[in-house]
Amino acid sequence: MNFSKLVVRKMPAHLQKLTVKSKTKVKSLKKNEYYTIIPETAEQEKVKVAIPIGKQIRVRQGDFVKRGDQLDEGNFDPHDILAIKGPNALHEYLVSEVQEVYRLQGVHINDKHIEVVVRSMLRKVIITDSGDTSFVNQQQVDKFLFDEENDRVEKEGGSPAQGTPVLLGLTKASLNTESYFSAASFQETTKVLTDAAIKGKTDNLMGLKENVIIGHMIPAGTGMKKYRDIEVFKDLPGDLDWDLAIGGRGRRSFRTFRVGSCFHCHTLSTCCRRGRG
């Protein structure tokens, strides 16, 4: 099992390049000094990890530790969790930590509200290998754009790009959005608008915030483009029963109907499905 870091509250610089291929064993342990990690394979050398003064140790002599295990008390560094365990583990950790703060005060919040914020914090990817894509190494791109570009290149038989997920703070996540209207309304308005003007950016108004600023309908519910031209048909006896009988497809049809017309034959006369006049 390969990994480049061990989880410690403050990681010493010499441990950041450590690579361990299997489980490690805590052999020698002395409080307030250090503990030695001995890999099971002979390829790796012994590593001494300093113990921060005043920290409670979570392992004992002879214990086996593996990738991502916490060696002393304290909070995890979110960047270490992202590098070692991946974005899914970091997502769960951040949601859990935020919920713990609210629950201690007797406040109950649905996870989905926090998950929306965390998702925006983990939406960017740093390009490590551009492959045959249009990206540049060390470029920070949106995760969805990254996947879309890789799919296009793979269909053409090219080499996809490689990237590393990055954790952004709330401020940076808000300023790095694709919409410059949304970014300018948050912070650094002059800088954001000047940068957008110099680069000739185009805002496609895909999100909620930018549409509210402009005064357009938000792209949600009946505000979505595919629902804007629909006319609601007149409710008549049997309409709901027929709609449920066909699995609700009638009310989700994206055609324009006349009031009182049949969803199947679009006539105002006898319905072909129900024999109704």
Curated annotation (Swiss-Prot):
Keyword Hydrolase in annotation: yes
UniProt-listed Gene3D superfamilies: 1.10.150.390, 1.10.1790.20, 2.40.50.100
InterPro entries: RNA_pol_Rpb1_5 (IPR007081)
Keyword Hydrolase in record: yes
Class of enzymatic activity (EC top level): hydrolase
EC identifiers of the protein: 3.5.1.16
UniProt keywords, alphabetically: Amino-acid biosynthesis, Arginine biosynthesis, Hydrolase
GO biological process, one term: DNA-templated transcription
GO molecular function annotation: acetylornithine deacetylase activity; DNA binding; DNA-directed RNA polymerase activity
Catalytic activity annotation: N(2)-acetyl-L-ornithine + H2O = L-ornithine + acetate
Pathway connected to this protein: Amino-acid biosynthesis; L-arginine biosynthesis; L-ornithine from N(2)-acetyl-L-ornithine (linear): step 1/1
Protein name: Putative acetylornithine deacetylase
Lineage: Bacteria, Pseudomonadati, Spirochaetota, Spirochaetia, Leptospirales
